[in-house]
Amino acid sequence: MSDIIDDFQKDVTINMQKCIDNFKININKIHVGRISPDILSFIKIEYYGVITPLCQLTNTVVEQPRTLIITVFDSSMIKFIEKAILESNLGCTPVSTGNTIRVTFPTLTESRRYSLIKMVRSESEKSKVLIRNIRRVSNDKLKTFLRNKEINKDNEHYFQNEIQNLTDIWIKKIILITKEKELELMKF
């Protein structure tokens, strides 16, 4: 029984950690005053039938605080890369010249900052819902364990409390990360 429960607890923790990791990745796409090539790291392009990360098809450097220069290795991919950047909802403008693409990001106005904060809060809520869904699925598994007599009623109650504690901890982390990102957005 203890092996089942140990594996179960590890799975719950791992799933909640993955949720937090994805949340961090998603809000790191939301840029503040400084731009880095990492802001494009999630963009993928179909290259000869294979979905390929942008970083494998290009070399990206920072030209100015709001401008990236992307050197494309295969010039036939320029239009596809421009399209992928435009569709990424980063609010930037790609302009190609030769085998390079210049990507300019807008300055952060107050209204743009507030819209970015709304995006961060939206991602935060999505992540909280995912954490709660993990809790719900986990509690359902506990009920199945109880029905199959793999655990008793006391163990079920104990592990439900443990799962609730984990849920509270991970949601607090999401709230903390959200507040940090909001402060970062308002600072620049």
Swiss-Prot record:
Keywords (alphabetical) are:
Cytoplasm, Protein biosynthesis
Cross-referenced InterPro entries, in alphabetical order? Answer: Ribosome_recyc_fac, Ribosome_recyc_fac_dom, RRF_sf
What are the recorded Gene Ontology BP terms? cytoplasmic translational termination
Query: Where is it localised?
Result: Cytoplasm
**Principal place where this protein is found?**
cytoplasm
| GO cellular component term of the entry, any | cytosol
Q: What molecular function does GO assign, one term?
A: ribosomal large subunit binding
Task: Give the Pfam families listed for this entry.
Answer: RRF
Tell me, what does this protein do in biology? Responsible for the release of ribosomes from messenger RNA at the termination of protein biosynthesis. May increase the efficiency of translation by recycling ribosomes from one round of translation to another.
State the family it belongs to: Belongs to the RRF family.
Put simply, this protein is called Ribosome-recycling factor
